């Protein structure tokens, strides 16, 4: 089974503005057997809505619940936490970015993200897709 992990902004775009997804991102999502988000993404999305950095037509909780029906939520495990803090100092320092990237690594999934800082990080296997 193929699972792809959606970065927070990709989860929003997929649900509300799919035209913002690249062709490769759209194909990765379309061909996946399962879509997943890291638990920290729910906080990020709620925060972005509260700060009006994303626009929702319905209350934030209703939107999050609707989105959650279509994706698997993946929590922070000890191995994800250890991988996140072990990323080099050259990796972006934002804890959410580290946790999301580490989640993809630990599960062996591709991370769909537009974030150039994450996409430019070198890893032994391809991690990101955009």
Curated annotation (Swiss-Prot):
It is found in: Secreted. Its EC number is 3.1.-.-. GO terms for cellular component: extracellular region. The keyword Disulfide bond does not apply. Transmembrane segments: none annotated. GO terms for biological process: negative regulation of translation. Belongs to the PINc/VapC protein family. Toxic component of a type II toxin-antitoxin (TA) system. An RNase. Upon expression in M.smegmatis inhibits translation and colony formation. Its toxic effect on colony formation is neutralized by coexpression with cognate antitoxin VapB22; the effect on translation has not been tested but is probably neutralized also. This is Ribonuclease VapC22.
